[in-house]
């Protein structure tokens, strides 16, 4: 019986070893360039003597992203929040091609430290609105609610005054 168990263990180990090869070219994901997709958002953090973790603990908080269908075309669009970069909204044109509609949609933001976002139809009109959270040490830290007007234009309709 011991010999049979040893034989089965040996065969099992050999099967595992033989099946573990790393020569497969079957990739599940392919990296697409920003020239192919149109998505070129970069939230680059530039540290210096006055802007670093010790003087500004929020420096590594942020760079959020929300994904949702803002124009009801059954294609998911992308909204990025930036810390040292402008917020960006990309409209999905299909086949992983996006248009940057940040300026025309009015969602670029200002000099706040944007840390995250979510999409929700807050006013129940059938279009996704964008809620953007803000952090920081100085200045106004009100979160922003961007209301989708249904024509790829957003208006800032409310602010969350958390008192922080």
Segments and roles (model prediction):
Residues 1-8:
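Bacterial N-terminal signal peptides that target proteins for export
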Residues 18-19:
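C-terminal motif of bacterial Sec signal peptides marking the signal peptidase cleavage site
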Residues 29, 86-101, 140-153:
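Beta-propeller blade repeat segments, especially FG-GAP/WD-type strand-to-loop junctions
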Residues 61, 85, 113, 141:
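Beta-rich catalytic cores
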Residues 69-71, 75, 93-94, 120-127, ...:
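Calcium-coordinating acidic loop motifs
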Residues 77-82, 130-135:
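Hydrophobic beta-strand segments that make up the repeating blades of beta-propeller
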Residues 154-159:
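Conserved small/polar residues in nucleotide/adenosyl-binding loops
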């Amino acid at each position: 019986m011991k010999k049979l168990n040893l034989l089965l263990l040996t065969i099992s180990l050999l099967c595992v070893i033989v099946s573990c090869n790393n020569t497969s070219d079957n990739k599940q994901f392919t990296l697409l360039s920003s020239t192919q997709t149109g998505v070129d958002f970069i939230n680059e953090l530039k540290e210096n003597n006055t802007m670093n973790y010790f003087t500004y603990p929020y420096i590594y908080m942020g760079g959020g992203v929300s994904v949702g269908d803002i124009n009801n075309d059954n294609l998911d669009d992308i909204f990025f929040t930036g810390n040292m970069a402008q917020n960006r909204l990309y409209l999905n044109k299909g086949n992983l091609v996006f248009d940057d509609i940040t300026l025309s949609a009015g969602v670029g933001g200002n000099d706040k430290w944007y840390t995250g976002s979510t999409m929700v139809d807050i006013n129940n009109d059938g279009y996704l609105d964008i809620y953007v959270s803000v952090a920081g040490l100085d200045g106004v830290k009100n979160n922003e609610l961007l209301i989708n007007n249904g024509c790829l234009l957003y208006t800032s309709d409310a602010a969350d005054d958390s008192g922080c």
